């Protein structure tokens, strides 16, 4: 069975897709999960499947439409964390002490979060898990701040430089987590980036990021993100 890395961008925007391609994708999903009811209303606006071994595109639909990746933005922050671990700048056991600001961000319930307590030590491994699984904005910012010495602009520069390096030509990062900086109620305020702007990327660019992530740091799968295997596809 081929190893597949599926980057399915479930962006609910006004941009339409061709009915034939979208319906085909819904039919494919229904065949993969015959016991589940796949509602066509949930069909993705952009979708892409690539071979995890080669990066070759196996399925595509509207892959170059620029959209807001929302919480999928956290993939780039995590990529930079894993890169820093490989470079020896920190380890999964490195301890980061939560600040009152971190706790305050965690209490912003309008954005995805989990409980963070000021003064408590969290390992990088724990923060990665909380970023990847419950999609915590607070822990994402904690990791970003650690790598940038608490300079959000520096970290955004790092994100955009890495996107350019990887060939993500239609990507622009304005925040580290997928929530516009203004959503943090003054607790996360980059100075050189528009605090009201949403991140911008495409399904193709996210596939590039996902391909390099799995290729360069495969332990993200299984250790932090569950892996589900389907046969005969």
Regions found by a protein language model. Give the residues of each.
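Residues that line or immediately flank small-molecule/substrate-binding pockets and catalytic motifs
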Residues: 8, 135, 227
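Sec-dependent signal peptide recognition
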Residues: 2-8
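Active-site-adjacent loops and short helices of periplasmic peptidoglycan-processing enzymes
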Residues: 22-203, 214
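Domain-terminus/edge residues, biased toward the C-terminal soluble/receptor-binding domains
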Residues: 1, 191-233
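Bacterial N-terminal signal peptides
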Residues: 8-15
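N-terminal signal peptide c-region/cleavage motif recognized by signal peptidases
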Residues: 17-19
């Amino acid at each position: 069975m081929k190893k597949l890395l599926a980057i399915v961008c479930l962006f609910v925007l006004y941009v339409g897709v061709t009915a034939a391609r979208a319906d085909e994708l819904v039919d494919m999903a229904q065949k993969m999960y015959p016991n589940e009811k796949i509602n066509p209303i949930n069909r993705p606006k952009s979708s892409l499947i690539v071979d995890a071994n080669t990066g070759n595109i196996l399925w595509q639909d509207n892959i170059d439409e620029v959209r807001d990746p929302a919480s999928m933005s956290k993939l780039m922050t995590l990529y930079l964390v894993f890169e820093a671990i490989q470079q020896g700048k920190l380890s999964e056991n490195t301890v980061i002490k939560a600040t009152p600001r971190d706790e305050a961000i965690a209490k912003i319930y309008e954005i995805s979060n989990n409980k963070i307590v000021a003064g408590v030590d969290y390992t990088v491994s724990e923060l990665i898990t909380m970023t990847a699984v419950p999609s915590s904005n607070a822990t994402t910012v904690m990791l970003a701040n650690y790598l940038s010495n608490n300079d959000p602009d520096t970290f955004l520069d790092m994100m955009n430089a890495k996107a350019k390096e990887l060939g993500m030509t239609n990507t622009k990062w304005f925040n580290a987590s997928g929530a516009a900086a203004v959503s943090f109620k003054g607790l996360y305020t980059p100075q050189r980036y528009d605090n009201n702007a949403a991140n911008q990327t495409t399904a193709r660019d996210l596939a590039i990021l996902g391909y390099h992530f799995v290729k360069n740091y495969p332990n993200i799968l299984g250790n932090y993100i569950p892996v589900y295997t389907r046969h005969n596809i």
